[in-house]
Structures are given as structure tokens and as C-alpha cells.
Amino acid sequence: MRLPAMTVAALLTGCAASSPPPLYQWTGYQPAVYDYLKRDKDPQQQIDALEKSLQEIRAKDATPPPGFHAQLGMLYASVGKDGAAMEQFGAEKELFPESSTYMDFLMKHKTKQP
């Protein structure tokens, strides 16, 4: 009776350990969007936080989540760094082609936000 219980436990342990890695690395993105919506931090602080998160994501050889580069691009545009904004919008389009229509809109109608 003891042997079958050990076998079942070993099988369950083996199954639990084989989970796939996450598709995207969300490091710092969700808090950054929350801060943006609450307007608790100025845009440059938010840019700094997202750039740091992006470095951490790249260090793990992972992919940032959808919207990460778009958010960073909108923050760059809000502080007048249009070149950096366009670069981020382009990165979003490349990683997530389904965002192309919106990224093209932002690239065409970039405006400085209050």
C-alpha cells in the first residue's frame, strides 16, 4: 500500500515541475501604467522606471508585454522626445503587428500631452 502512494506522489511532483515559462515578462509594467493613470509621478520618473524594467527584461532574454513600448513612447512624446517616441512605437509595431494601426495613428498624430 505504501509503494503505490509513493509512486503517485512522485508522478504528481514530476508533472508540477514542468510548467512552461511565461510568454511575456511583466516586470514593472503594470505599476508604471497605474502610476501614469493616477498621475502620481511625473513623466520622466515613469520613463526612468520603464527603462529600468526594460533593461531587466532584456537581461532575462525575455519579451516585454504588449503595450510596453507604446506606453514608453507616449511618455517620451509627452516630454518632447519625439525621436525616442517614434523608436518605441516602431518597436511596438515590430513585436506586435496587430498594434500597427494604433501605432501608425500615434506616429502620425503625436502631440505633447499636458
Regions found by a protein language model. Give the residues of each.
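Sec-dependent bacterial lipoprotein signal peptides
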Residues: M1-C15
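Bacterial Sec signal peptide processing site at the extreme N-terminus
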Residues: L11-A32
